């Protein structure tokens, strides 16, 4: 059946709005699938039906803007609509829901349908939930990783080694890629770093780099830039590298699901797809991180290493201290300013510098650039000499930014509120989750100037009335919201040496 097209400004990738009488004539209900065919060019996609009795008249079809990207229809043109077959991937998802193991072919079918929008958001959520309740074993993780790579773009460099680095997240202020990438590239190695934007954090690496330069490039452009200057820091979502991963992450977000198997596949698929054969994984360990204990960290590290071996990649993991933020800044502009200051020669903050050179040093040792045990010093020498700054400026320039940018050019939001210590004592705890929440309330990462600047960290003796941290915001209402809601978060806890006094029974 043919219908007149009306383009709806809805970004959903796979959807169509039909009058309920037209849907009945086609033989479909709400949530069913139809095949949409553009008669001009024979392009066809599958879309999920939503019915209406008022928003669409009979004979017209409301095609979502996201769906039309693959059909190239214009308003008023005709479209052919047919009932679509039920995808086989739904049977495989049901198999996983029932506790079964997925084969290589079944996993590939599911991921192909994810990429081609053959399954709905609800069905993808069912797959994610099934994999969370019935965890993937290592063979299934390998199948998932390879399927993610196979259904997207890949980069193949003419020579090796190709280095990459990833942090599993959970720690605010973890801006180390802004140092690690230029240090490694300045050593003569190649590091095509594709990064994520923040979903639950105050600033992903891509959000930070976007303060300085464009981060949206194709896979081919990433390869060309890496060949020219040795490294990139780009947003992976623009490259079509492992595209299924981005869609899975979006469905995980509302439930805060972070299934172990899918996390392993997510990280390693992107590294494999950019051609990396040497990978360093940062696993922050701490009470308010994704990995609460060293034992859990070692277990996760072994899983990354095993998956790497299955893929022909050498992986080393660093268990890093995650109970406090990295450095003193949280939020895009604040973190970028802190990173530039270190690249320009600042010798603080030590936590930021030490973590960055340690991870860069592992990569240098893995590649053979440095002997075992000397990598961190080599990384420190590259940083101290100014070679890392020079390389970072080259990366900024090739990505379309200003290579002459200085730390003082990067400013926080104009609205600020200082939080002072309520009593004298030691800072005994810094709650990473609360700090991230507070920075997001202030507007980060969308508002680049929003965030938190810490004035003291865990273990510091502080007097009543001295500043603990400053909240920055670009909009006054955002600052007020952060201050009001932040009163219940207690992101920094100060206690005296005397915790309590227990009197004798005679004094009770």
UniProtKB/Swiss-Prot annotation:
Biological-process GO terms, alphabetical: AMP catabolic process; pyrimidine deoxyribonucleoside metabolic process; pyrimidine nucleobase metabolic process
Q: Which InterPro entries match?
A: AMP_phosphorylase, Glycosyl_Trfase_fam3, Glycosyl_Trfase_fam3_N_dom, Glycosyl_Trfase_fam3_N_dom_sf, Nuc_phospho_transferase, PYNP-like_C_sf, PYNP_C, Pyrmidine_PPase_CS
Record SUPFAM superfamilies? Nucleoside phosphorylase/phosphoribosyltransferase catalytic domain, Nucleoside phosphorylase/phosphoribosyltransferase N-terminal domain, Pyrimidine nucleoside phosphorylase C-terminal domain
One GO cellular component from the entry?
A: cytosol
What top-level branch of life does the organism fall under? Archaea
- Annotated EC: 2.4.2.57
User: GO molecular-function annotation terms?
Assistant: 1,4-alpha-oligoglucan phosphorylase activity; AMP binding; pentosyltransferase activity
In this protein, the active site sits at 258
One Pfam entry for this protein is PYNP_C
- Where along the chain is AMP bound? 170, 196-201, 205, 266, 290
Catalysed transformations (reactions): AMP + phosphate = alpha-D-ribose 1,5-bisphosphate + adenine; CMP + phosphate = cytosine + alpha-D-ribose 1,5-bisphosphate; UMP + phosphate = alpha-D-ribose 1,5-bisphosphate + uracil
Q: Which UniProt keywords apply?
A: Glycosyltransferase, Transferase
Which NCBIfam families does this entry report, sorted A to Z?
A: AMP_phos (TIGR03327), ARCH_P_rylase (TIGR02645), PRK04350.1 (NF003338)
Q: Which family does it belong to?
A: Belongs to the thymidine/pyrimidine-nucleoside phosphorylase family. Type 2 subfamily.
| Entry function | Catalyzes the conversion of AMP and phosphate to adenine and ribose 1,5-bisphosphate (R15P). Exhibits phosphorylase activity toward CMP and UMP in addition to AMP. Functions in an archaeal AMP degradation pathway, together with R15P isomerase and RubisCO.
> What is the protein name for this chain?
AMP phosphorylase
From the broadest rank down, the organism's phylogenetic lineage runs: Archaea, Methanobacteriati, Methanobacteriota, Stenosarchaea group, Methanomicrobia
């Amino acid at each position: 059946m043919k219908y007149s097209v009306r383009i709806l400004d809805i970004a959903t990738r796979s959807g169509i709005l039909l009058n309920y009488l037209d849907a009945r004539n086609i033989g479909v209900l709400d949530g069913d699938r139809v095949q949409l065919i553009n008669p001009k060019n024979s392009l066809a996609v599958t879309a999920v039906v939503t019915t209406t009795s008022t928003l669409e008249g009979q004979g017209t079809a409301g095609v979502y803007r996201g769906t039309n990207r693959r059909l190239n229809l214009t308003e008023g043109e005709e479209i052919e609509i047919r009932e679509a077959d039920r995808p086989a991937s739904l049977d495989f998802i049901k198999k996983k829901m029932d506790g079964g193991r997925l084969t290589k072919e079944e996993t590939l079918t599911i991921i192909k349908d994810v990429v081609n929008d053959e399954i709905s958001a609800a069905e993808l959520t069912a797959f994610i939930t099934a994999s969370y309740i019935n965890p993937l074993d290592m063979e299934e993780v390998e199948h998932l990783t390879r399927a993610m790579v196979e259904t997207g773009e890949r980069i193949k460099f003419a020579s090796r080694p190709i280095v990459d680095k990833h942090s599993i997240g959970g720690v605010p202020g973890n801006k180390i890629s802004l140092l690690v990438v230029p240090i490694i590239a300045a050593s003569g190695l190649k590091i095509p770093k594709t990064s994520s934007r923040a979903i639950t954090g105050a600033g992903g690496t891509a959000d930070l780099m976007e303060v300085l330069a464009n981060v949206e490039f194709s896979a081919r452009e990433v390869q060309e830039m890496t060949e020219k200057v040795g490294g990139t820091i780009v947003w992976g979502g623009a490259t079509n590298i492992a595209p299924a991963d981005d869609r899975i992450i979006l469905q995980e977000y509302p439930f805060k699901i972070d299934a172990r198997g899918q996390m392993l596949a997510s990280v390693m698929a992107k590294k494999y797809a950019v051609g990396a054969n040497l990978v360093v994984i940062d696993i922050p360990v701490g009470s308010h991180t994704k990995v609460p204990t060293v034992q859990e960290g070692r277990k996760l590290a072994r899983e990354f290493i095993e998956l790497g071996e299955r893929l022909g990649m050498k992986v080393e993991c660093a268990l890093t201290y995650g109970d406090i933020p990295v450095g003193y800044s949280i939020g895009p502009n604040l973190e970028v300013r802190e990173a530039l200051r270190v690249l320009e020669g600042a010798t603080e903050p030590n936590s930021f510098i030490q973590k960055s050179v340690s991870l860069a040093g592992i990569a240098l040792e893995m590649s053979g650039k440095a002997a075992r045990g000397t990598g961190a010093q080599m990384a420190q020498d590259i940083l101290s000499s100014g070679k890392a700054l020079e390389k970072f400026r080259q990366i900024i320039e090739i990505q379309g930014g200003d290579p002459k940018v200085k730390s003082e050019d990067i400013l926080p939001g104009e609205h600020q509120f200082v939080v002072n210590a309520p009593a004298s004592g030691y800072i005994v705890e810094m709650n990473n989750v609360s700090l991230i929440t507070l920075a997001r309330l202030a507007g980060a990462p969308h508002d680049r100037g929003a965030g938190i600047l810490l004035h003291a960290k865990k273990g510091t003796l502080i007097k009543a009335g001295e500043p603990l941290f400053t909240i920055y915001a670009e909009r006054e209402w955002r600052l007020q919201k952060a201050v009001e809601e932040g009163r219940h978060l207690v992101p920094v806890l100060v206690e005296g040496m005397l915790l309590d006094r227990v009197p004798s029974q005679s004094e009770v």
